[in-house]
Curated annotation (Swiss-Prot):
Subunit-level organization: Homohexamer.
Protein name per the record: Uridylate kinase
The gene coding this protein: pyrH
An example Gene Ontology biological process: UDP biosynthetic process
Keywords assigned: ATP-binding, Cytoplasm, Kinase, Nucleotide-binding, Pyrimidine biosynthesis, Transferase
Organism of derivation: Wolbachia pipientis wMel
InterPro entries membership: AceGlu_kinase-like_sf (IPR036393), Asp/Glu/Uridylate_kinase (IPR001048), Uridylate_kinase (IPR011817), Uridylate_kinase_bac (IPR015963)
E.C. numbers: 2.7.4.22
GO CC term (a single one): cytosol
Top-level EC class as recorded in UniProt: transferase
Listed transmembrane segments: none
Length: 247
């Protein structure tokens, strides 16, 4: 696809990692998958790929199974987390199919080997896929219990040398309180990593934020519903950026 010089000059990032929650795949449903919502999400990712940006994705599994919730109900935590990892593989395969319907080559790489349905995670192989213009979808989190997919996203972003972590949520940025419950909640345009930790703003868990901070990878929090993903790549639209850089 031809990319104009103006479009190239607008692109702020050359390699990005999207963190997509399982809930984002539910759409308006309470459980499972909303194929229309997944289709729209996939089209947004395709638009980013068409700009020549290298894209990798970490997908959650909360629309199918939540390990922490199950452990509170009596299921062993480690077992619950492994079940949650399997849920992320299901989501990754569905997302892969939608991307390939839009003629974007993609590969699912799982931290838990499952050779008949996806590739095992190998860092150098993942980077090679990105260099060839394929979308890489990381499944099964880190492959270890007790670590969230947020931590997996930060880890993979570091390993892939990504320019930014893009966290798509239900709201258009980071707020001082839940805007759905508190109409006085204030949205922040910019925060530092320390702000997230000290104010307990619940954007990502502490280990994910620490990994991003140690490796100077900014985190952008934006709405998957109200904002075109391609605008974020160009530095446009409404979002919160988490970084220690002042510019």
């Amino acid at each position: 696809m031809f990319i104009s010089t103006n479009e190239k000059s607008e692109i702020k990032y050359s390699r990005v990692l999207f963190k997509i929650s399982g809930e984002a795949l539910m759409g308006s449903k309470q459980f499972g998958h909303d194929m229309e919502a997944i289709g729209e999400l996939s089209k947004g990712i395709v638009e980013v790929c068409n700009l020549g940006v290298q894209v990798c994705i970490v997908v959650g599994g909360g629309n199918i199974f939540r390990g922490t919730s199950a452990s509170l109900s009596g299921c062993e935590r480690a077992s619950s987390d492994y079940i949650g990892m399997l849920a992320t593989i299901i989501n990754a395969l569905i997302l892969q199919n939608f991307l390939e319907k839009n003629l974007v080559a993609s590969r699912v790489l799982s931290a838990i080997p499952m050779a008949t349905v996806c590739e095992p995670y190998i860092r150098r192989k993942a980077i090679r896929h990105l260099e060839k213009g394929r979308v890489v979808i990381f499944a099964a989190g880190t492959g270890n219990p007790f670590f969230t997919t947020d931590t997996a996203a930060a880890l993979r972003a570091v390993e892939m040398n990504c320019d930014v972590i893009l966290k798509g949520t239900q709201v258009n940025g980071v707020y001082s309180a839940d805007p759905k419950k508190n109409e006085d909640a204030v949205m922040y345009d910019r925060l530092s990593y320390t702000d997230l930790l000290t104010r307990d703003l619940k954007v990502m868990d502490a280990s994910a934020i620490s990994l991003a901070r140690e490796n100077s990878i900014p985190i952008i929090v934006f709405s998957l519903k109200g904002e075109k993903i391609v605008n974020i790549i160009k530095g446009q639209g409404t979002y919160t950026i988490v970084s220690d850089c002042k510019q």
